[in-house]
């Protein structure tokens, strides 16, 4: 049995962490992004399928490429963020399964059912996006996840050559605490959970 993480770690990951809308002018290095990936990749996925693919958009050119895909409410904060991660999924994730899941012929589960492959890729890349958020927080970075963008435009701009499909965007950097909104309420256990 694992030991519980301490209260401070729980605060860092959950109770004191916030979704940021404004960013300090402080860069995020390639080494930091690799450290985030090396942490998030350890989170579980179905049959270790690991379908998430990430483009870390950080250059001025990359941000301008992203600009026309953004909803108006997400434009300013995304252009200001040091990094915007496009979390996508690879529909052909199963080609990596002989390496990632060598216990059996898991690849055939998905090549024989395109619908299962698509559902698995979307579900598990969403799960990995959550791991990305918590890995950023664990590494001292703030995040601002968003779904307000035009997926077709993002896919055309960034994934025309590889067929990946965008799932969500996550701004990454050092959040400006002066631009935080008040914390919104959450549902109680009794409002959201059942015991069966």
Swiss-Prot record:
Family matches, as InterPro entries: Nitroreductase (IPR029479), Nitroreductase-like (IPR000415), Nitroreductase_HadB/RutE (IPR050461), RutE-like (IPR023936)
GO biological-process terms attached to the record: nitrogen utilization; uracil catabolic process
UniProt source species: Klebsiella pneumoniae subsp. pneumoniae (strain ATCC 700721 / MGH 78578)
Function per UniProt: May reduce toxic product malonic semialdehyde to 3-hydroxypropionic acid, which is excreted.
Annotated GO MF terms: 3-hydroxypropionate dehydrogenase (NADP+) activity
Alphabetical keyword list: Flavoprotein, FMN, NAD, NADP, Oxidoreductase
Family under the similarity heading: Belongs to the nitroreductase family. HadB/RutE subfamily.
Name of the featured protein: Probable malonic semialdehyde reductase RutE
């Amino acid at each position: 049995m694992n030991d519980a993480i301490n209260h401070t770690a729980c605060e860092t990951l959950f109770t004191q962490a916030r979704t940021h809308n404004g960013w300090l002018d402080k860069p995020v290095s390639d080494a930091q992004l690799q450290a985030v990936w090396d942490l998030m990749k350890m989170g579980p996925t179905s049959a270790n399928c690991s379908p998430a693919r990430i483009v870390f958009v950080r250059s001025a050119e990359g941000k301008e490429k992203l600009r026309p895909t953004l909803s108006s409410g997400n434009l300013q904060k995304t252009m200001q963020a040091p990094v915007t991660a496009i979390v996508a999924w690879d529909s052909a994730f199963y080609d990596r399964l002989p390496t990632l899941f060598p216990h059996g012929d898991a690849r055939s589960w998905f090549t024989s059912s395109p619908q299962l492959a698509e559902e698995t890729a979307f579900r598990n890349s969403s799960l990995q996006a959550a791991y990305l958020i918590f890995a950023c927080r664990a590494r001292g970075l703030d995040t601002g996840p968003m779904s307000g963008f035009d997926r077709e435009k993002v896919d055309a701009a960034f994934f025309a050559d590889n067929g990946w499909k965008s799932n969500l965007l996550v701004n990454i950097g050092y959040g400006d605490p002066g631009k935080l909104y008040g914390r919104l309420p959450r549902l109680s256990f009794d409002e959201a959970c059942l015991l069966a």
